[in-house]
Amino acid sequence: YHQYVDAVNHFHTSEIKAEQRRMLSIIRSSPHTGYYVDIFRSDVTDGEDRYHDYIYHNMGTGSEFFLLSGQPMPMSASPLDSLSGKGYSYFTTLGSCENPDNFYVDYHLGIDDTHMRMFVPTGKGRTVYQLNSLFNHRYYEPSLRTLPVPALLIRQKSEAWDHPFIAVYEPYGNGAKSQIRSVY
């Protein structure tokens, strides 16, 4: 039983001479389960690829980062640097890890047993940051409106066109078990 929906987005900006493409697919694996596949490519077209960032926010009360073995991801206290730009000051760094192997992140909603599990294959020259961002006053759940939003940033210190960011997201909980074990 498989159904899918595919969406492709293409972004070109003249301010920084970059081209970005995102492909997002929704895959239904059963009448009650499914997952999302996100592939994001980024290329600086008129200069040096210093770095590219992939950012994901998930509503909820927190996140936990794990290696595929199930062990917690070893995190250091290295924060995002001030050269990242003005918008990055809205993030609080909870930890970071350089060049991790394949890993997953478990985001928990915190008001019931709802989770989002994010699987990310390894990539060279990457630093993964566990972050909190500002609260989102528009959440449908009032108890979450004043809490920081759990987030992740993956910084790749090279081109991200031939080596794109890939993430697979699987919602689970409230009786639905996580089906995905790894992504390579």
Label the predicted regions.
Residues 1-184:
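CBM-like, beta-strand-rich accessory domains located in the C-terminal region of large
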